[in-house]
Amino acid sequence: MLRLPDEHRALFRNPFGTLYPEFSMVLPHLAGRAIYTVGDVVTANILAAGILPAIAIIDGYTRRLPCPPALLHQARQILVKNPAGAITDELIAAIGDAAANPPALIVVEGEEDLAVLPVILAVPDGGFLLYGQPGEGAVLCTVDQQAKERAREMLALFEQV
């Protein structure tokens, strides 16, 4: 398991892509690309827009409050445990499985926020990762070699436990 040390948490407050204050501003950019979502609200919004994400990762909460479950009837579900501030081997394996066999809904018992990094590394270049930035909007990240390098650099800050 990888754990994010407290001294590096502030680095993860910066968007890992372009921040859009309104979800509707993201939609015109999504046509023709594989979409990957991390977070309950952004997943619910993408489904409401009629888009089925290749991978959706949720934990049932938004800003630490219960969130109605995203309904992905066309996707198989993978259940994993992942504590806050960590990335477990179980989560990484589930993301790899989902990337190889989409669509998939990964339901996390615990916290899904840091799943952004292993998703970027697991999926092919050319897709879009979409996740919520609490209180600010939605972040859209183009998955490419630059994003993968940044994800590797950020993962290097984690401790193996």
From Swiss-Prot:
<feature type="binding site">
    <location>
        <position position="40"/>
    </location>
    <ligand>
        <name>GTP</name>
    </ligand>
</feature>
<keyword id="KW-0547">Nucleotide-binding</keyword>
<feature type="binding site">
    <location>
        <position position="42"/>
    </location>
    <ligand>
        <name>GTP</name>
    </ligand>
</feature>
<comment type="function">
    <text>Catalyzes the GTP-dependent phosphorylation of the 3'-hydroxyl group of dephosphocoenzyme A to form coenzyme A (CoA).</text>
</comment>
<comment type="similarity">
    <text>Belongs to the GTP-dependent DPCK family.</text>
</comment>
<keyword id="KW-0808">Transferase</keyword>
<keyword id="KW-0418">Kinase</keyword>
<keyword id="KW-0342">GTP-binding</keyword>
<dbReference type="InterPro" id="IPR007164">
    <property type="entry name" value="GTP-dep_dephospho-CoA_kin"/>
</dbReference>
<feature type="binding site">
    <location>
        <position position="112"/>
    </location>
    <ligand>
        <name>GTP</name>
    </ligand>
</feature>
<protein>
    <recommendedName>
        <fullName>GTP-dependent dephospho-CoA kinase</fullName>
        <ecNumber>2.7.1.237</ecNumber>
    </recommendedName>
</protein>
<dbReference type="GO" id="GO:0015937">
    <property type="term" value="P:coenzyme A biosynthetic process"/>
</dbReference>
<feature type="binding site">
    <location>
        <position position="41"/>
    </location>
    <ligand>
        <name>GTP</name>
    </ligand>
</feature>
<feature type="binding site">
    <location>
        <position position="59"/>
    </location>
    <ligand>
        <name>GTP</name>
    </ligand>
</feature>
<dbReference type="Pfam" id="PF04019">
    <property type="entry name" value="DUF359"/>
</dbReference>
<keyword id="KW-0173">Coenzyme A biosynthesis</keyword>
<dbReference type="GO" id="GO:0016301">
    <property type="term" value="F:kinase activity"/>
</dbReference>
<dbReference type="GO" id="GO:0005525">
    <property type="term" value="F:GTP binding"/>
</dbReference>
<comment type="pathway">
    <text>Cofactor biosynthesis; coenzyme A biosynthesis.</text>
</comment>
